[in-house]
Amino acid sequence: MIYKVLYQKDKIVNPRRETTQTLYMEADNMVEARSTVEDNTPYNIELIQELTGNSLAYEKEHADFKLTKFDKK
């Protein structure tokens, strides 16, 4: 499954909508997606959303869609 992860670059600064960034990743479930991002980055995760059907098609067409791959630990 493909997940859209909204995050802030670090956990120290208070989150602001204007600085929220996005990455797209593949994972078996939402728990795995969260743990993978937490284990490999210093990011403050705001939201993880599963993308399917029309949502996935929209993101591929209208966003800077690129799957992020993390090394397995």
From Swiss-Prot:
Task: Give this protein's Gene Ontology molecular function annotations.
Answer: DNA binding; DNA-directed RNA polymerase activity
Pfam families from the xrefs? RpoY
One GO BP: DNA-templated transcription
GO CC, one annotated term: DNA-directed RNA polymerase complex
Alphabetical UniProt keywords: DNA-directed RNA polymerase, Nucleotidyltransferase, Transcription, Transferase
**Reaction(s) catalysed (UniProt annotation):** RNA(n) + a ribonucleoside 5'-triphosphate = RNA(n+1) + diphosphate
**Top EC class for this record:** transferase
- Identify the EC number(s): 2.7.7.6
Q: Which family does it belong to?
A: Belongs to the RNA polymerase subunit epsilon family.
Subunit structure of this entry? RNAP is composed of a core of 2 alpha, a beta and a beta' subunit. The core is associated with a delta subunit, and at least one of epsilon or omega. When a sigma factor is associated with the core the holoenzyme is formed, which can initiate transcription.
User: Mind telling me which NCBIfam families this protein's record contains?
Assistant: PRK13667.1
Query: What is the role of this chain?
Result: A non-essential component of RNA polymerase (RNAP).
Kindly provide the name given to this protein in its UniProt entry: DNA-directed RNA polymerase subunit epsilon
* Species whose genome carries this gene: Lactobacillus helveticus (strain DPC 4571)
Gene name tied to this protein: rpoY
